[in-house]
């Protein structure tokens, strides 16, 4: 499905150079953070908000797919594991009356998919005062220490000033899973989360070197 959001994104990717202010929704999850989240709440098999160059999971939805129109629960039933989201924070936008962005829409959709079954894990800004903050999440793990995100692979800086210097913020891992039986809240230091990610990446590399899984 194409819409004005997808068309603008395609044009941005193909531009000869870029400015940081243009990145918008396209910041990537750093590998260590993703694998740390995976170690804690995975296996993460479905990336809800990705593109072909930055997907973190074996299966993913692109902007053209519009995750807010997909059956996450049904897809996870086929794949096994959990879904992951580094969601877009742009204001709510619609195409033919269907939401295509907006954190409130995303969190509400996650809550609805939760009722159908499955685990949905989001790495988000720790913004408890925002109207989109999911008070009904089954678990929230607050990250001690500010986190940052990576530029998209297609980003070509227009000049030397286009380097991220302050894209760090308080973060949290939000889990929707009606089978969750643990505590409602927890905390983890960023360094510990990254250490979990580093260990999991080492394990994955070791397993890949052993050949096919039986």
Regions found by a protein language model. Give the residues of each.
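Class I S-adenosyl-L-methionine-dependent methyltransferase catalytic core
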Residues: 1-214
């Amino acid at each position: 499905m194409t819409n004005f959001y997808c068309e603008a994104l395609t044009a941005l990717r193909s531009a000869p150079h870029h400015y940081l202010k243009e990145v918008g929704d396209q910041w990537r999850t750093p590998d260590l953070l993703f694998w740390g989240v995976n170690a804690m709440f995975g296996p993460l098999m479905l990336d809800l908000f990705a593109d072909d160059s930055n997907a973190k999971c074996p299966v993913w939805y692109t902007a053209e797919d519009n995750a807010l129109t997909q059956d996450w629960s049904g897809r996870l039933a086929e794949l096994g594991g959990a879904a992951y989201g580094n969601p877009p924070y742009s204001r709510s936008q619609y195409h033919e009356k269907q939401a295509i962005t907006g954190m409130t829409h995303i969190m509400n959709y996650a809550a609805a998919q939760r009722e159908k079954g499955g685990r949905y894990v989001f790495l988000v800004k720790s913004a408890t005062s925002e109207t989109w903050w999911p008070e009904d999440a089954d678990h929230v793990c607050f990250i001690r220490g500010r986190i940052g995100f990576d530029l998209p692979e297609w980003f070509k800086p227009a000049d030397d000033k286009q380097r991220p210097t302050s894209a760090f913020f308080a973060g949290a891992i939000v889990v929707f899973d009606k089978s969750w039986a643990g505590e409602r809240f927890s905390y983890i230091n960023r360094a510990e989360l990254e250490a979990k990610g580093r260990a999991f990446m080492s394990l994955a590399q070791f397993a890949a070197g052993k050949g096919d899984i039986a």
